[in-house]
UniProtKB/Swiss-Prot annotation:
Role, per record: Protein S19 forms a complex with S13 that binds strongly to the 16S ribosomal RNA.
Name of the protein in its database record: Small ribosomal subunit protein uS19
SUPFAM superfamilies reported in the protein's UniProt record: Ribosomal protein S19
This protein's UniProt keywords: Ribonucleoprotein, Ribosomal protein, RNA-binding, rRNA-binding
InterPro entries in the record: Ribosomal_uS19, Ribosomal_uS19_bac-type, Ribosomal_uS19_CS, Ribosomal_uS19_SF
Organism: Crocosphaera subtropica (strain ATCC 51142 / BH68) (Cyanothece sp. (strain ATCC 51142))
HAMAP family: Ribosomal_uS19
Pfam families on file: Ribosomal_S19
Amino acid sequence: MSRSLKKGPFIADSLLTKIEKLNEKGDKQVIKTWSRASTIIPAMIGHTIAVHNGKQHVPIFISEQMVGHKLGEFAPTRTFRGHSKGDKKARR
């Protein structure tokens, strides 16, 4: 079920204040955040946000196509290393 339109999108307050400050200055710095649940808004376009994936911060450049999505969608938390090659017993 999606979020109510009456409430508006969720954005962490600390992240929103950092973006507003950078927009006032016209500065382009990498913003570190742990808030994967924050929704991308049009004010974030053109900024690079480093989203935490559980181990490190993954830098993400925000473009127009990303608006409305969550930050966590662009920072995968799991790495797939492939299936084991030499498992002969499982094939029989």
